[in-house]
Each structure stands twice: as C-alpha cells, then as structure tokens.
C-alpha cells in the first residue's frame, strides 16, 4: 500500500548549499522531517549545478515522516538576468530597457527550461522565455 501524503513543501534552495538554517530548517522541522538527511541528499543531487543558483524543490512529506523531493530547473528570470549580465530587471519594463538577449541565448535557456515548461515544441518554449525577458525589461533580438 502506498504511503499517505501529509504535505507538499515548495522551497527555493541554492544549489549545493542546503543547510538547516531558514528557510529549509523551519519548513521541514514543523513537519517532523529529518532536516540533515534532506540537506545531504539535496546537496549531493545538485552538486553538478552552478553553486548558489536557486533551485526550486518540491518536497513530499509522508505520514511516517519520510520524504521524497523533486528538483526543478532554475527560474527563467534568474537565467535571463545571468545571460544579460544584469543584477535586477527594469522597474518599468515597457519603457526602460536594461539589457539585451539574443535568440541564441533564448534558445539555450528554453532548452534548459523545457522539462518544466508546458510548451509543445522548442519554438513555443522560446516564445515563452522571450515573454519573460520582455517583462524583465530586456530587449529580445530575433524573436
């Protein structure tokens, strides 16, 4: 028989840097999950990724206090800001442009994000990422 699911916990944790301090500790502690076990397995799983890159994770907590987790791809906004070489988006994205991204950069980001996007094909994924870029105040070339 399958275990009974008690809760889903959604967090953004820096790759390879999970530790018991907030936000990880309190979120898992109130559900009775072994925090150090999560930190060790998460850090091992995200070891190959760029250190410090925020990784969304969905933790499924079961009634016997065991857990499983699924890591997602980094948020599109972070990948776009990194590609454009900026630290934050525009406060007025329609009028103030803060940077540029090329079609090649959009394709690369779309390829990375494809497992998490609900796009039918690569072209639709590129258009989705281009929309995110425009909402950050980035100019999109070739889209």
Curated annotation (Swiss-Prot):
Q: Name one GO cellular component term.
A: cytosolic large ribosomal subunit
Q: Which Gene3D superfamilies match?
A: Ribosomal protein L11, C-terminal domain, Ribosomal protein L11/L12, N-terminal domain
**Which Pfam families does the entry link to?**
Ribosomal_L11, Ribosomal_L11_N
Q: Which SMART domains match?
A: RL11
Which UniProt key words apply to this protein? Methylation, Ribonucleoprotein, Ribosomal protein, RNA-binding, rRNA-binding
PTM (free text): One or more lysine residues are methylated.
- Name the SUPFAM superfamilies for this protein: Ribosomal L11/L12e N-terminal domain (SSF54747), Ribosomal protein L11, C-terminal domain (SSF46906)
Quote the PANTHER family the UniProt record gives.
Answer: 60S RIBOSOMAL PROTEIN L12, LARGE RIBOSOMAL SUBUNIT PROTEIN UL11M
What the protein does comes down to: Forms part of the ribosomal stalk which helps the ribosome interact with GTP-bound translation factors.
According to the record's subunit comment, the protein's assembly and interactions are:
Part of the ribosomal stalk of the 50S ribosomal subunit. Interacts with L10 and the large rRNA to form the base of the stalk. L10 forms an elongated spine to which L12 dimers bind in a sequential fashion forming a multimeric L10(L12)X complex.
Q: Which HAMAP family match?
A: Ribosomal_uL11
**Official protein name in the record:** Large ribosomal subunit protein uL11
Tell me the organism. Nitrosococcus oceani (strain ATCC 19707 / BCRC 17464 / JCM 30415 / NCIMB 11848 / C-107)
């Amino acid at each position: 028989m399958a275990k009974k699911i008690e809760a889903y916990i959604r967090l953004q944790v820096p790759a390879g840097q999970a530790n018991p301090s907030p936000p990880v500790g309190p979120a898992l502690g109130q559900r009775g999950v072994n925090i150090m076990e999560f930190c060790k397995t998460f850090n091992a799983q995200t070891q190959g990724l760029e250190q410090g890159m925020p990784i969304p994770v969905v933790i499924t907590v079961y009634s016997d206090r065991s857990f499983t987790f699924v890591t997602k791809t980094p948020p599109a906004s972070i990948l776009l800001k990194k590609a454009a070489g900026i630290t934050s988006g525009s406060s007025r994205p329609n009028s103030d442009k803060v940077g540029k991204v090329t079609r090649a950069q959009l394709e690369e980001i779309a390829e990375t994000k494809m497992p998490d996007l609900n796009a039918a094909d690569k072209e639709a994924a590129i258009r989705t990422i281009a929309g995110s870029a425009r909402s950050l105040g980035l100019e999109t070339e070739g889209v």
